[in-house]
Amino acid sequence: MLKEFEIEPLLKDKVPHQTKAVVAMSGGVDSSVAAVLLHRLGYQVIGVTLQLYGADGNSNTRKKGVCCAGQDIYDAKRVAEGTGFPHYILNYEEIFKKEVIESFAQTYIQGKTPIPCIKCNQTVKFRDLLQVTRNLGADVLITGHYVRRLEKNGEVKLCRGIDKSKDQSYFLFATTKEQLKLLRFPLGGFYKCNVRKLARYFSLPISEKPDSQDICFVSENYSKTIAKLAPQSIQKGKIVDVNGKVLGEHNGIVNFTVGQRKGLGIAYSEPLYVVRINTKNNEIVVGPVNALMQRKILVKELNWLEQPKKGMEVTVKLRSLHSGSLAKIYPAKEQNKAYVILNDDYFSISPGQACVAYKDEQVIGGGWICS
């Protein structure tokens, strides 16, 4: 059966048994299959799992659909021990709290909609795990992400995964060229259903484990999590229309996101949506659907894997499930910012989300939406 799952050699100048590979193991099916597959192919596999929260017993260790705590750490260790390769657990709770959880809360307090999974990949999982990889004297860092790394004539490209329903390239736009030198994604050329089959073929105890879905550290809902982290942020304020007319009262801006319709708590003659969040005045601004249609986007903190030319035509994704919109990219006057001009109006562009640009299957790069 392994012949059906051929992968490119991890290194062109080393055979498998000479190649040391650190595998980031979350305790889920994907990273477990990646680790066991490489072990079966003869690579020197070292499993590493980061404990990101829950050591104090007060966090989300038993919630289903999350990763990197409690049962998931046990599952990763069980897979490694059952297969016969070393496995290490590293406590990264303090770093995760600072880089991801506190950033998540602060972004909401600023009236934006964060994506903590991108921040986690950008910092803890890639920046820090790549350093662990170097410290262990390993050649490559492996993850179970559904993306592809293509290399030709010394140029490395990051591309969408073959399985479009599982493609995770949007979440990896902040990956740098330097990081791609050591990163490998062996599952990018597979469909998830076949990865499940491989897990069963390997008789892995987690073969039927459901995919992680939720924000791992949010135990109930995000506003309650933020209230615990920053209770001072939960302050009542006004709900106003686009002309400034007071329509009602809100119980804290962290309970609202741009584009939200439900839960506004006001009656009106037509459907109203959150158009913007005015943190300075602690106001929620609402309006009709056409007030949320937008074509021009300002993007900051850019990371380009291929530097776009002025006016370059691309496809952009403005949220993870967005199928993509045609657009052109132009440099902004401010450093490390750019304007993305969509061909057509788009509904509800949320500050704090990522704007990721593609050229066909290749990830060109992206940044964070300002406005």
Swiss-Prot record:
EC number: 2.8.1.13
SUPFAM superfamilies, per the entry: Adenine nucleotide alpha hydrolases-like
Alphabetical keyword list: ATP-binding, Cytoplasm, Disulfide bond, Nucleotide-binding, RNA-binding, Transferase, tRNA processing, tRNA-binding
Active site: 120, 216
GO cellular component, one term: cytoplasm
Site (Interaction with tRNA) location in chain: 145, 353
Keyword tRNA-binding in annotation: yes
Superkingdom per UniProt: Bacteria
Subcellular location: Cytoplasm
Binding site for ATP: 24-31, 50, 144
Catalytic activity: S-sulfanyl-L-cysteinyl-[protein] + uridine(34) in tRNA + AH2 + ATP = 2-thiouridine(34) in tRNA + L-cysteinyl-[protein] + A + AMP + diphosphate + H(+)
Disulfide bridge positions per record: 120-216
GO MF term list: ATP binding; tRNA binding; tRNA-uridine 2-sulfurtransferase activity
GO terms classed as biological process: tRNA wobble position uridine thiolation
One Pfam family it belongs to: tRNA_Me_trans
Residue ranges, annotated region (Interaction with tRNA): 166-168
InterPro entries assigned to the protein according to its UniProt record, in alphabetical order: MnmA-like, MnmA-like_C, MnmA-like_central, MnmA-like_central_sf, Rossmann-like_a/b/a_fold
Family: Belongs to the MnmA/TRMU family.
NCBIfam families cross-referenced by the UniProt entry: PRK00143.1 (NF001138), trmU (TIGR00420)
Function: Catalyzes the 2-thiolation of uridine at the wobble position (U34) of tRNA, leading to the formation of s(2)U34.
Name this polypeptide is given: tRNA-specific 2-thiouridylase MnmA
Source organism of this protein record: Wolbachia sp. subsp. Brugia malayi (strain TRS)
